[in-house]
Amino acid sequence: MKILIVVDMQNDFITGALGSAEAQAVVPKVKGYIEQWLEEKKGSLYFTRDTHHDNYAETQEGRNLPVLHCVEGSDGWEICRELQEYTLDVPVFDKPTFGCQDLAEYLQETEGQPDEIVLIGLCTDICVISNAMLLKAFFPETVITVVEKCCAGVTPESHKRALEAMQVCQIQVV
């Protein structure tokens, strides 16, 4: 069985407080990948959503990245309009930090030992790598794959470095 996880495709990472041209460019690629995944019935689909609150500045992340973003209930917190239809019937995991331990535990309980977990989304160098590494730890015998063309980092350089780091840790980059 295969699982596709769409990481943090939220307005604040695309056009908002932490948006970039690279993130905007991957939206149609992510949409196409999801459509193909569903059309070919490859497996389960999940989304993650970075979720913060008004006390963000008081958190460790907020002290290190002092840009208020993805505040629950705000437009920036929402999954981008182009992908919202795909979230209607699948689990969306709100996460207060880079990696989503709740998602990993849920997959362990409901999916057993997947053959492959595929990750796409934002940001390669923060939340994609964090979730890929977390899932590799939870599922050491599962192939973890990151689709390069469907990810963007904070910068093109940090995107590339994150992909290289994941490859060193036996995460497939395709």
Model-derived segments and spans:
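Internal catalytic-core helix/loop-beta-alpha segment
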Residues: G73-I126
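Active-site acidic carboxylates
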Residues: M1-V92, T145, V154, H159-V168, ...
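Short, glycine/serine-rich, charged loops/turns that create anion-binding
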Residues: Q10-N11, H52, T97, T124-I126, ...
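Histidine-anchored nucleotide/phosphate-binding helix
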Residues: K31-W37, I129-F139
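Phosphate/ribose-phosphate-bearing ligand recognition and processing surfaces
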Residues: G121-S130, F139, T145-P156
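Short strand-loop junctions, especially beta-strand C-caps/beta-turns
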Residues: G16-L18, P96, L122, K149
